[in-house]
Amino acid sequence: MAVIKMTDLDLKGKRVLLREDLNVPLKEGRITSDKRIRAALPSIRMAMEAGGRVLIVSHLGRPVEGEFDEAFSLAPVAAHLSRELGRDVRLVKDYIDGVDVAEGDCVLCENVRFLKGEKKNTEELGRRLAALCDIFVMDAFGAAHRAQASTHAVARFAPVACAGPLLAAELDALERALDAPKHPLVGIIGGSKVSTKLTLLDNLSHRVDRLIVGGGIANNFIKAAGYEVGKSLYEPELVEEAARLMAAARAAGGEIPVPLDVVVGPELADGAPATVRKVSEVGPDEMILDIGPATAALYREILLAAGTIVWNGPVGAFEWEQFGAGTRALCEAVADSPAFSIAGGGDTVAAVEKYGVASRVGYISTGGGAFLEFLEGKELPAVAILQERAAQS
């Protein structure tokens, strides 16, 4: 994608407004996962080492816009950044009229959602944020699907607008996987409902060579193939849609394989018994909660032969140990495959980490909604404006 990259610019002495995604989960004021902070650290360090006067901007949670709320303050993030960077990272509450930052240093601006106009992407707030900097760096892939003042309007009015290292890496990985993939291209889409991923399934069914479906989504395809699903979660009104997607994949020279066997239980609960059944033998009082070993072996074969793998969503209820074997097998197959693989989405990342294969997946996306929207073929507003600015330069 044609965007200006931060790494191509001279930052020395420049005011750099660095938009990161530091929207970390908090419990009683304590950070429960610093994954997003760790992902942003290399970009922050790089901007400081290049001599930039760095103002870091992020949102946190969903406060009432325009009102300060201690519960959504970035104070815990500032403390965490201070520890990680080995220097005091000031949290600046009132920054909209300008902040003095020394060359090679950084400050953290308070939650951008405390500013009126952020969510509405107002021109006024965009111009005021742009006035804070010489260079605007969009590095928050996790917020790239949102047209908001700190992700979009500011990029319209900043003297220079570019992609940070994290955003650039995300775009490069997604381009490699979808725009210029090595074939066979295999998609893995899991999740509970077809309705939430219909656009995604539709887009991928025309592009991939094989589309593996899992979780509750797979039940619609099992039903469309003429099998019973018992008490399993599925959407009766979308069975025809599943049949259409299977036909569309075949027409495009691809395939959406239906599981050969499944793991069933009477309910989704701790201690619920797990039984392997052929897909044709699911009982009326049983729920499909994972793929079976024969299906896992089939999917492994497909994944080991792949050139590129795009993965969003687990294939079973892996939070329960007895229904996690399929997702574990899938994780190991992706890790063992010589293909370039990209995985994204909260549940997928949790599975990859749980089964210890994170270091063997080609790229793990930091974006949930943005990753999904890119896979759906939608334009990401924060990326589109960077492309526009690059074309004008």
From Swiss-Prot:
List residues binding ATP: K197, E319, G345, G346, D347, T348
Localisation? Cytoplasm
Record: residues binding substrate: D21, L22, N23, R36, H59, L60, G61, R62, R113, R146
Q: What is its EC number?
A: 2.7.2.3
- Which of UniProt's keywords are assigned here? ATP-binding, Cytoplasm, Glycolysis, Kinase, Nucleotide-binding, Transferase
State if Ribonucleoprotein is listed as a keyword: no
What pathway, per the record? Carbohydrate degradation; glycolysis; pyruvate from D-glyceraldehyde 3-phosphate: step 2/5
One Gene Ontology cellular component annotation held by this UniProt entry: cytosol
InterPro entries from the UniProt entry: Phosphoglycerate_kinase, Phosphoglycerate_kinase_CS, Phosphoglycerate_kinase_N, Phosphoglycerate_kinase_sf
GO MF entries: ADP binding; ATP binding; phosphoglycerate kinase activity
* Domain of life the protein comes from: Bacteria
* Gene Ontology annotations of biological process type: gluconeogenesis; glycolytic process
Reaction it catalyzes: (2R)-3-phosphoglycerate + ATP = (2R)-3-phospho-glyceroyl phosphate + ADP
Keyword Ribonucleoprotein belongs to the record: no
User: Where does it mainly reside?
Assistant: cytoplasm
Identify its protein family: Belongs to the phosphoglycerate kinase family.
Q: How does it assemble?
A: Monomer.
**Protein name as catalogued:** Phosphoglycerate kinase
Native organism is Nitratidesulfovibrio vulgaris (strain DP4) (Desulfovibrio vulgaris)
